[in-house]
């Protein structure tokens, strides 16, 4: 869980940032930790798109998409909304920093 990957940037585009989705190998542990810190998170995509009923039979080729299936198990949405104050952003960042500091002392 020592590594979190944030949203990427694509040249010459702007992101609306309605979701702030990160990747983490130990997503469920991270989510539990943040909940204990009073920080809500969400798993907006509990299954890969090609596995959802609405897309059944609509995907050409193999119905197994390794990278997609691997990724959806690792993504977690952190708080992101217009009313989120700078103090709340700082609280989320501090909780993540606390987690990484705790982990680094255990190694």
Model-derived features: where do they sit?
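PLP-dependent aminotransferase class I/II
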Residues: 1-107
């Amino acid at each position: 869980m020592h590594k979190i990957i944030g949203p990427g940037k694509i040249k010459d585009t702007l992101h609306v940032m309605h979701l702030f989705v990160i990747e983490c190998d130990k997503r469920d542990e991270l989510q539990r930790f943040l909940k204990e810190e009073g920080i809500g998170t969400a798993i907006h995509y509990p299954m890969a798109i090609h596995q959802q009923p609405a897309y059944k039979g609509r995907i050409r080729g193999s119905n197994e998409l390794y990278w997609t299936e691997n990724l959806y198990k690792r993504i977690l949405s952190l708080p992101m909304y217009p009313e989120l104050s700078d103090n709340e952003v700082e609280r989320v960042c501090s909780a993540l920093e606390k987690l990484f500091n705790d982990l680094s002392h255990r190694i």
